[in-house]
Amino acid sequence: DAHYLSHDAQVVADYRADPQCHDRISARLARFIADAGPATVATAPTWAVPTLLMWAGADRLVNPAGSRAFAQAAPPAVVQSHCFEGAFHELFNETPEYATPVLQMLQDWLLARFGVKY
C-alpha cells in the first residue's frame, strides 16, 4: 500500500499519480531479491566497503529484518547502521520529523569519512 511510503501525504500522492509506478515486479526480480538477501547477509562478516546502512523501523513495504541482520553481522568499524523507529519506507522523502535526522546522519557520515558535505 502506497500509504506506507512516507508520512508525507504529498509524497504518497505524487507516487500514486506517477504513471511509471506500479505494484508489480518480474519473476526474475523476485527470484533475485529472494536469493541475494541471504547471500548478502552471509558476506556481511567480511564486508570491507565503508557503508552507512539506514532503514525505516516502521517499513511495511519491505521487511527491515534483512537490514538488521546485515548490520549485526557486519564489522562495526566498516558498517555504521541505524534504524529510524517510526519512519516509513522512503527515509529521504519523509516528513521533517523523520527526514531531518536521516539527512543529518548522512551528512555527518560523509563528512567523517570523505570530507564531503551533503
Q: What do these predicted regions represent?
A:
Residues 49, 63-73:
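Short alpha-helix in the alpha/beta-hydrolase fold that links the catalytic acid
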Residues 1-28:
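Alpha/beta-hydrolase-fold enzymes
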Residues 25-43:
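Active-site nucleophile elbow and catalytic-triad environment of alpha/beta-hydrolase enzymes
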Residues 22-23, 58-62:
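Acidic catalytic loop of the alpha/beta-hydrolase fold
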